[in-house]
Each structure stands twice: as structure tokens, then as C-alpha cells.
Amino acid sequence: SSSFSRRAATTEGYGMFALVEYLYNTSNINYVDKNLIGSFGHSAGGLAAIRGAQYFGKQSKKLSEENKLHSVFVSGMVRMGFKEKDIKHVDSNVGLSYALYDEGSWQNELKNGDMSIAPEALNLVRHQVSDPSISKIGIDSFYGKLNDRNLTVVHNEKVLHPMQPYLFEPMKNQIDFFLKTFNIDRSIVATNQVWHWKEFFTLVALVCSFLLIVPFAKFLFSKYPSGPFQIIVFNLDILLINKLIVLGPISNPIS
């Protein structure tokens, strides 16, 4: 979503808070299980996800009702949203994935990407299982119970931050988390991923679009019209060429 707010992740979840409210309260979308609404985000989107868990956690305690956000998965973000004062409001299942070689890990409390001893990750796990004595996290191990809405897992893949949405292991961890928390039949295993073919053919389309710029421009100018339509066609030609050069194909990773 777009917002003029500089705190859009915290105050709006980039639009996710309103979307969850709509899904939960409307009768228009009857194919969504209102008791199994989840949220996933990477990087700044990860901040929005954990802020959502906190926002709806506060709301559920205030109204004495079940949290509307059943489960959240946070990818590539711990430097914000994981302080004790924030985490104490969470009462959703939480999955955390942080790249061991994240180039932004210098911003974390210990200046590295090791989640087994990261204070931010420890704050999460300690709160979820109500055990302040935990001093080291078992990576890829589940803590808490699904029925208590405090199931928690921390992943620490040996990759870079921007590669998390583009590699099989991080994607598998995300899928497995929601399969587990939503009790979904695992007839299709999380390793059976096909999204990478979309990215591959998007790359092919990008290369082809650049290769076509010169021959396409030559074709447009080869049979140039005369008369009053000449200026109009010329402007359209320039517009099309600029669009090819500036934009090319646009792709959004599946996450």
C-alpha cells in the first residue's frame, strides 16, 4: 500500500491491519476461514507482520476476544519490533527467519546475524513460552503449543538478506510454518516449489525486451506516415520506445 506516514509499518502494517479487519468482519468473502488469518512479510514487511501481531494482541486483550491474527511469519527483520515492551503484546503463533549473513545485521543488538543468542529472538521465545531462563535458542526447533497460540520457531538460513525470498530453503521454512499452524494437509510437500520458473521466464522476457529495442524502433520508422497524422505517430513511437527502455517487464516475487 502507499502511505504518507513515516511509520506506516507500525501504525498501519502497510495496509495489512485494515485488510485483516475486513477479512474478519465481512460476510462478503466466505471462502476465508476467519479463525485462520495469517500474515507474512520480508524486511520492512516483516516489521509490519510483527507489528500486526502486537496490534491485534493489544486489541484482543482490550476486548477480551480471540486474536484476529492467528499466525505471523517474520522474515529478515529483528532490529525493530522485538523489544520486550513490544513483544509482550503478542499472542499469535510466530515464525522468525533471519539470514545468518544478513548485510544489515550490524544494526542488531549484538551486531551479527546469529539468532541462537540474539536478544531480539530471545525476547520473542521467552515471551511466547513464559520462560525467562532460556539463554540459547534451538534453531529450527518449535517452542510452545499450537492450541495455546504461542507456537514459535526461529530459522537462521546461511544466506544474504535479499536472497531470502528467492531461495528454496527460506521459502520451505515459511510454507512449513503455515502448514503446521493452520493444520493443512501436507499432500503437497513444501519442497515442491515451482515459483522459480516464473522468475526465470521473467528474466528471459527482460533480456528479450532489450534485444528488441533497436529492431522494433527500426520497424516503427521504416514505413513512416505522411500528412496530419505524422506528429501523432511520431509521439507514439517515442512513448513506446521510452516505455521499453525505462520499464521493461515487471516482476514481483511470490512470498
Cite the ranges covered by each PLM segment.
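Core alpha-helical transmembrane segments of integral membrane proteins
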Residues: 192-255
